[in-house]
């Protein structure tokens, strides 16, 4: 019986960390429970919208403004593996392909690096303690020694989880008006009217991130103060100008999106 318990103990790392998500084969209609994820990344895909009489309402975000049915809404296919997701815009040729992080995984590279480091450490630790348990059981058959080692194993696991949590907490980007420089490309794709994206001198403003962006005159377009927040599982920015306008997105959302700009233009027209 004790031998079976030891074998089970050795497989704890696999049970804890080798959990695989249910694969999603290529399909034009993702699972309903995943619509919130896909319609954040691929908001222009037809599976996100319910269109009747030329008016389309978003299936995932009920408070989303209705839009007119037009070429903005494209046919898409989605494909999810255990470690990444892909969606294809199939209504144009050649197909446009976007690879994203799946929403089940927290999405920043630093986070994944930390997770991988601690997973490896925990796995080695479990196997090391498990091997010591087996050796002691065979050599001494000392129940007291085995109990001590089990307690040590539990303490090791709890301490490692605490250290991991503290490391992740320290790296969170708290609310602030200026995001870290490494994230400017992300923020300036979505909130390109925010003042932290521009370097203005003598009334002429140049984009800090996209060097090929033509210079523009300093005007109200870029006089918005923006507050950004980067949490572990989502990012959002608030445009502070006359009234608040909040946009929530996945932190790993692909850059150079055009659907958001197009949507804003259509809403302005409406």
Curated annotation (Swiss-Prot):
Induction: Expressed in the immediate early phase of the viral replicative cycle.
Location of this chain's protein in the cell: Membrane
Keyword set includes Membrane: yes
Coiled coil spans: none
Signal sequence annotation: 1-26
Record keywords: Early protein, Glycoprotein, Membrane, Repeat, Signal, Transmembrane, Transmembrane helix
Annotated GO CC locations: membrane
Name by which UniProt lists this protein: Protein MGF 110-1L
Origin species: African swine fever virus (isolate Pig/Kenya/KEN-50/1950) (ASFV)
Lineage per the UniProt record: Viruses, Varidnaviria, Bamfordvirae, Nucleocytoviricota, Pokkesviricetes
């Amino acid at each position: 019986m004790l031998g079976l318990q030891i074998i089970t103990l050795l497989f704890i790392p696999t049970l804890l960390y080798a959990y695989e998500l249910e694969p999603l084969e290529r399909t034009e209609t993702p699972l309903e429970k995943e619509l919130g994820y896909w319609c954040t990344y691929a908001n222009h895909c037809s599976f996100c919208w319910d269109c009747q009489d030329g008016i389309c309402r978003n299936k995932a975000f009920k408070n989303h403004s209705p839009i007119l049915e037009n070429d903005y809404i494209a046919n898409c296919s989605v494909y999810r593996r255990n470690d990444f997701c892909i969606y294809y815009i199939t209504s144009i040729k050649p197909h446009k392909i976007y690879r994203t992080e799946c929403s089940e995984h927290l999405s920043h590279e630093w986070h994944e690096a930390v997770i991988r480091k601690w997973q490896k450490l925990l796995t080695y630790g479990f196997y090391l303690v498990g091997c010591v348990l087996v050796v002691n059981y065979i050599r001494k058959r000392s129940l007291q020694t085995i109990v001590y080692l089990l307690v040590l194993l539990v303490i090791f696991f709890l301490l490692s989880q605490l250290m991991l949590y503290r490391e992740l907490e320290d790296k969170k980007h708290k609310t602030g008006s200026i995001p870290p420089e490494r994230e400017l490309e992300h923020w300036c794709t979505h909130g390109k009217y925010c003042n932290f994206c521009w370097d203005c001198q003598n009334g002429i403003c140049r984009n800090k991130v996209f060097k090929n962006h033509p210079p523009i005159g300093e005007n109200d377009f870029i006089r918005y103060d923006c507050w950004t927040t980067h949490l572990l599982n989502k990012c959002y920015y608030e445009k502070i100008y006359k009234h608040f306008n909040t946009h929530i997105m996945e932190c790993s959302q692909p850059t150079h999106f055009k659907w958001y700009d197009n949507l804003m233009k259509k809403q302005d027209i409406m």
